């Protein structure tokens, strides 16, 4: 079964700052929980993403067991959106659409992840027992880190 995870977060910065941060693969380790041991393995010439870009990672999502993960950037609309698609990794399907909407308060970040686990019924069981909760925790951690990075000096309304 295909699942969808959607998150929004308003950050207090300009579109160029948001794009530069989120489109740089090396920043993923900053917004991923430390216990996942997320490491970008691809040596990147610079931080500019492009369609067709392949990025290799190592991550330990469960029981501290390292797994290889490879994504391809399948779509880029400069300073508006990009999509990463898992080519190799733990999911049967992983498609993450990142959208950036400039507004009077800075930038609204929208994440839409479409994903499916392998192994049919067993994958669905794993999803209901721990995978969904783990993904929500990862995006919750990310939200907290981004609040500190971008919104700590925001004036209360």
Regions of interest found by a model, annotated:
Residues 86-137:
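Beta-strand/loop substructures that line and gate deep hydrophobic ligand-binding cavities in soluble
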Residues 1, 156-157:
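Basic/polar N-terminal segments that are highly enriched at the extreme N-terminus
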Residues 15, 74-81, 99-108:
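A short, structured loop/turn motif at beta-sheet edges
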Residues 40-88, 141-144, 148-149, 153-154:
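Glycine-rich portal/gate segments that line the openings of hydrophobic small-molecule binding cavities
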Residues 11-13, 59-63, 75, 90, ...:
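Beta-strand elements of well-folded, non-transmembrane domains
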Residues 1-46, 50:
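Hydrophobic ligand-binding cavity/cleft-lining segments
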Residues 4-6, 66-70, 92-96:
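Short, surface-exposed coil-to-beta transition loops
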